[in-house]
Amino acid sequence: VIRCVGNPDRRFNEDALRMLRAYRFCAKLGFSMDETVKTSIDTNASLIQYVSIERIVHELKEIMETNPQVLADMTLLLKPVFNELDLALRCSQNSIYHYTDVLHHTLDAMCYLKPYDETLAFALLFHDLGKVQVKTTDSNGKDHFKHHAKVGSELSKELCRRFKLTNEQRKWIPFYVLHHDDKFTCDLDCIYKYRVTYHLDEEHLLNLLQIRYCDAMAHSEL
């Protein structure tokens, strides 16, 4: 069980990053969190805005690699720096293709990423965030998310800058988000389009296919 030494409020006011570390220990070690610690984190969540983004992203990466599902419990804590997660949690998907909200679909998709790759993990984390902005509901109550990949790609550019990711990641993450929902067929014409039109080498084409696989595995069985 994750506990604080002494008063949790005092510990988190000394260094707000400790709130993220508590979740990281839960993710890496499989521990549960003491209720007083969880309550204190919820109370002091706004303090995270005073922590440098580099320190926050370092902890975020550790959680993404070990157990991304923990992020579902961190939306309030991350809200000052990554409000998009909370919006995704609140974005339901009443569709034959989905069984859960945008955030839980995203985290489920990330769990299929084997072996782990940091760039692809961020691409998966960002891939459906555009749905929040484009969601519509038809007369039958079914939800639609037209052009979410394009909107999400633009949003991912901003997130890459906000999180100070590498130049290589800033180049490829928005590309993967933009094309994650493309209609793809395993024929020469389709492969030619990606290899020539988008100048993809084998590595990046396989990366895109891996993202599509993870996304597909986190969909409903039709």
PLM feature spans:
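Glycine- and charge-enriched loop/helix tracts that form the active or gating conduit
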Residues: 1-117, 121, 125, 129-143, ...
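Divalent metal-dependent catalytic cores for phosphoryl transfer on phosphate-bearing substrates
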Residues: 112-221
